[in-house]
Amino acid sequence: MNQVEMTEFPVGKPEEALYGVASTPDGALWFTLAKGNAIGRLSPDGEVSRFPLPHADGQPTTITCGPDGRPWFTLSSANAVGRLSPDGALRMFELPRPASRPFGIAAGHDGCLWFAEMAGDRIGRITIDGDIEEYDLPVKGGYPSCMAAGRDGLMWFTLNQAGAIGSISATAAPRIFPLGAADAAPVGIASDAQGALWIAQAGNGAIARFDAGGRITEFPLHSRAARPHALAADAAGNLWFTEWGANRIGRISEAGDTAGYELAAPGSEPHGIAIDPHGCVWAALETGSLVRLQASPRD
């Protein structure tokens, strides 16, 4: 692959805990400030906008582009899902049951958003009009974390404390699939073009592949302490991920070949990751910047 250029764009302060990032079709990047209690937008021309949230400590975390092209996000402490319009109009949807701590969120094939309830042992589904349904999981204390839409029409999720992943749809009951490593602690999950699921295993420093036949292949990274966190798939068949514990952005091909890109500042703490419409990779650094990785021609 071509060489990679990395460019940082300061969008917040370290104490605001920049966490999630998502791209919308207009080329904008939206991000969450978990301790800054705000959602931000980086426009294609580099302008930064902020949208304060009404809760004193809502803890916005994961963010995604919804079926309507707008950013949707979870507020773990406020027990809600939010949506923003480009002009800053905010809608908040409180979850039916208290203290559910919603975290991961992803758009589904059914035109709805699906989200994981870490403390509720449930998966939620919300229409773009705000109607919410919840589905109890058969595993208690599993800590459902991140979500992804599979090529099979199902929604897939990680169970961080259960060392497993699961699938669900509005018409299919949840199914649970244990991963190979007891200490996997899966967080991020993404689907590739072949229908396989890729999982970031923060506990043992590995990326796992779960194919359509249910086979699990584990790819150890350079260090068990790398703590891979979020995952995103690009159009070329690569999976990109943040290495929270190693201060790197990683890449793995569908064949399992890996590469890593060191971040410029020590202790950047990369978390969320997204691919923009031009194929550039963006990651959210807790130190307050979005970093863009883009291919450059070889010398």
Swiss-Prot record:
Monomer. The gene is vgb. The active site is at 271 (proton acceptor). This is Virginiamycin B lyase. Inactivates the type B streptogramin antibiotics by linearizing the lactone ring at the ester linkage, generating a free phenylglycine carboxylate and converting the threonyl moiety into 2-amino-butenoic acid. One of its GO terms (molecular function) is magnesium ion binding. One of its GO terms (cellular component) is outer membrane-bounded periplasmic space. Keywords: Antibiotic resistance, Lyase, Magnesium, Metal-binding. SUPFAM superfamilies: Calcium-dependent phosphotriesterase (SSF63829). InterPro entries: Streptogrm_lyase (IPR011217), Vgb (IPR051344), WD40/YVTN_repeat-like_dom_sf (IPR015943). Mg(2+) binds at residues 269, 286. It comes from the Bacteria. GO terms for biological process: antibiotic catabolic process; response to antibiotic. Its cofactor is Mg(2+). It comes from Bordetella pertussis (strain Tohama I / ATCC BAA-589 / NCTC 13251). Its EC number is 4.2.99.-. Substrate binds at residue 229. Belongs to the Vgb family.
